[in-house]
Amino acid sequence: MKIILLGAPGAGKGTQAQFIMNKFGIPQISTGDMLRGAIKAGTDLGKQAKTLMDAGQLVPDDLIISLVKERVAQADCAKGFLLDGFPRTIPQADALKTVGIQIDYVLEFDVPDEVIVERMSGRRVHQASGRTYHVVYNPPKVEGKDDVTGEDLIIRADDKPETVLDRLKVYHSTTKPLVDYYQAEAKAGNTKYFRLDGTKKVEEVSQELDTILA
């Protein structure tokens, strides 16, 4: 079961990815996590990626594809995997085909921009542990402090409203064509395509996914 999740940053893909992983026992391959790992490790790729991400720009295809190819070859991907944040462009989608990766399901999470901005600009992160909070949906017990350590929470650079808006512009201009691409693939019988309303309650979206993937 090889699955692609499509949707803007903050559309709820990460939450539903957890549900799919737990339900079906396949790993999530998140380019965001891979990139943050590379940035934390201070690799050349990480340094290049950080500069671009801080400016709200996308990381170029060749850097991402090399990360993804390496990851899907690992043993835990034998039964399938979940791609989150990749592909983002038609060349990336073509690159998946070129390296022989057949996608079974494409799941699009549809959420209006204004909802995304509210969701993302409210995120707060405990840097050392990666624990994430939200001022509206999942607030810490003490405002601005981590529940476990009491240390300060930060706003990641890519969660600031102006950066979120920049990322949404980039998303709409580069990733929206993927919707057409994969809908055409679905019509040709090469994959299955489903659009989900990402503004619904988490449990409702999970239930829909359960039905689709069962």
From Swiss-Prot:
On the tree of life, the source organism's domain of life is Bacteria
Region NMP, residue ranges: 30-59
> Known Pfam families for this protein?
ADK (PF00406), ADK_lid (PF05191)
EC number(s) from the headed UniProt entry: 2.7.4.3
Q: Which UniProt keywords apply?
A: ATP-binding, Cytoplasm, Kinase, Nucleotide biosynthesis, Nucleotide-binding, Transferase
Q: Which residues bind ATP?
A: 10-15, 123, 132-133, 200
- Give the enzyme class: transferase
The Gene Ontology biological process annotation of the record reads: AMP salvage
Its chief place of residence is: cytoplasm
Residue segments, region LID: 122-159
Alphabetical list of InterPro entries matching this protein: Adenyl_kin_sub (IPR006259), Adenylat/UMP-CMP_kin (IPR000850), Adenylat_kinase_CS (IPR033690), Adenylate_kinase_lid-dom (IPR007862), P-loop_NTPase (IPR027417)
Which residues are recorded as binding AMP?
31, 36, 57-59, 85-88, 92, 156, 167
| Cell compartment(s), UniProt | Cytoplasm
Record pathway: Purine metabolism; AMP biosynthesis via salvage pathway; AMP from ADP: step 1/1
Annotated Gene Ontology MF terms? adenylate kinase activity; ATP binding
ATP-binding among the record's keywords?
A: yes
A single Gene Ontology CC annotation of this entry is: cytoplasm
Does the keyword Chloroplast feature in the UniProt annotation? Answer: no
Spell out the reaction equation it catalyses. AMP + ATP = 2 ADP
Q: Which PANTHER family is this protein grouped with?
A: NUCLEOTIDE KINASE
Q: What does this protein do?
A: Catalyzes the reversible transfer of the terminal phosphate group between ATP and AMP. Plays an important role in cellular energy homeostasis and in adenine nucleotide metabolism.
- Can you quote the domain comment? Consists of three domains, a large central CORE domain and two small peripheral domains, NMPbind and LID, which undergo movements during catalysis. The LID domain closes over the site of phosphoryl transfer upon ATP binding. Assembling and dissambling the active center during each catalytic cycle provides an effective means to prevent ATP hydrolysis.
Q: Which family does the similarity line name?
A: Belongs to the adenylate kinase family.
Subunit structure, as described in the record: Monomer.
Q: What protein is this chain from? A: Adenylate kinase
